Amino acid sequence: MLVKVFSFFILMITMVVIGVSKEYCDDKQSCQNFLLELKAGSSSLSEIRRRDLLIIVLKNSVRRIDMVMIGVMDDTKQHEEMENDLLGVKEDTKLFEEMMESTKDRMIRSVEELLGGEFPNRGSYENVHTWLSSVLTSYITCIDEIGEGAYKRRVEPKLEDLISRARIALALFISISPRDNTELISVIPNSPSWLFHVDKKDLYLNAEALKKIADVVVAKDGTGKYSTVNAAIAAAPQHSQKRFVIYIKTGIYDEIVVIENTKPNLTLIGDGQDLTIITSNLSASNVRRTFNTATVASNGNGFIGVDMCFRNTAGPAKGPAVALRVSGDMSVIYRCRVEGYQDALYPHSDRQFYRECFITGTVDFICGNAVAVFQFCQIVARQPKMGQSNVITAQSRAFKDIYSGFTIQKCNITASSDLDTTTVKTYLGRPWRIFSTVAVMQSFIGDLVDPAGWTPWEGETGLSTLHYREYQNRGPGAVTSRRVKWSGFKVMKDPKQATEFTVAKLLDGETWLKETRIPYESGL
């Protein structure tokens, strides 16, 4: 008994020392249980520095994921004959395995960054914060997407356990924030080692020159090396730190394109957003899982899309149907058209930048949990299914420590020619998760937007915890006198507040965007 009391005493001292118990860890019981588990394998836990403890937690979590994957696969084989929806289970299993591999990759990269000599400058800190946030996003995506049934009942408790562990890791990480370290002021952060090197292929402002030096060419008329986009992507090297450019000539490419996370630093460049078109019509009505409906899904870090169209033609009656899903860190979409209806653009996770794009849809047509900034984009609401309202954003930040949010800056928010603004209401956003974070700044807002501006997801959920902001917008829809009265919504007056949602602050863009050679505005 004395041994147990002493162990628990040491545990509580440890938690106080590392600043987790009171200030950083919301789930106290999970923190205690997990740290007890770690204590069993470490006789000197109370003496370990916070960063070292976090590394232990992450390594432990990677091992846990391996155990969970093996257990789920074995369990699924044993119960396969009991499943009523084998096709759905196969789809769920594929998604589960993809998400688990993604989380392992992010945790391993986080450990490497924590062990690196640059930590904790601002650049390396934001890298780890991004990746650990994305781990939680992947787990939550699994729970959201896996269909109801025996498979989900077996998997969900394991996912809940992984979520608790990921939240503990994130809480530990927050406790070693460098923001109070004055020594960091003079540090110039660097891009992570896997981000592409700057060479002659990175002169993106000269699109014609870039096409001429592309690694491969795709053409419907036979003038390129490949006739399909997928064939060209298959030819790209794996785990490359050098940029691989694919030029896709004018044409309509009817195919489902998936860029795996083993193919970083990939550029797709077309002849223009009205000339090079990748299209499909998958929707939740025939594919079941929104995550898998994307016409183009990019999971690779450092992805860049230029001068092309990503289209989903499923239509307003088919439910969620993604045109473009982006799940890779430090991704850029430049001068592209994203065209769909519900959930048209899915910035799923990690850091993303959209510049001079045309984005059109209906319900939640910019949705996800990425850290994403949209600059100089045309955001166009179109006619939805009868009885529906349009909602532009559905940002899904689930926990306060997660690093995510959307900024719409210097964009035009308007109606398509087919939208009946007299009968269809359009809103700037609604909270997919309770800490949903969106800022609309310095933009033109047309009269299509309802005077309330924002709409609830369900009842009062998240209205006091969300972070919805507006700043210096103009146009008939920008009048804020009749906006919602939620405590989580604010009209910003102070430019210092608005600065927190800029490329430099929200996206940490100065550490990586300049390497892409895509134009951007760092501040207001």
UniProtKB/Swiss-Prot annotation:
Output the lineage of the source organism: Eukaryota, Viridiplantae, Streptophyta, Embryophyta, Tracheophyta
The name this protein goes by in its record:
Probable pectinesterase/pectinesterase inhibitor 19
**Which UniProt keywords are present, listed alphabetically?**
Aspartyl esterase, Cell wall, Cell wall biogenesis/degradation, Disulfide bond, Glycoprotein, Hydrolase, Secreted, Signal
Species assigned in the record: Arabidopsis thaliana (Mouse-ear cress)
Query: Which reactions is this enzyme annotated as catalysing?
Result: [(1->4)-alpha-D-galacturonosyl methyl ester](n) + n H2O = [(1->4)-alpha-D-galacturonosyl](n) + n methanol + n H(+)
Site entry: Transition state stabilizer: 342
Q: Which Gene3D superfamilies match?
A: Invertase/pectin methylesterase inhibitor family protein (1.20.140.40), Single-stranded right-handed beta-helix, Pectin lyase-like (2.160.20.10)
The record's Gene Ontology cellular component field reads: extracellular region
Which of this chain's residues are annotated to bind substrate?
A: 290, 430, 432
Output the superkingdom of the source species: Eukaryota
Q: Which residues form a coiled coil?
A: none
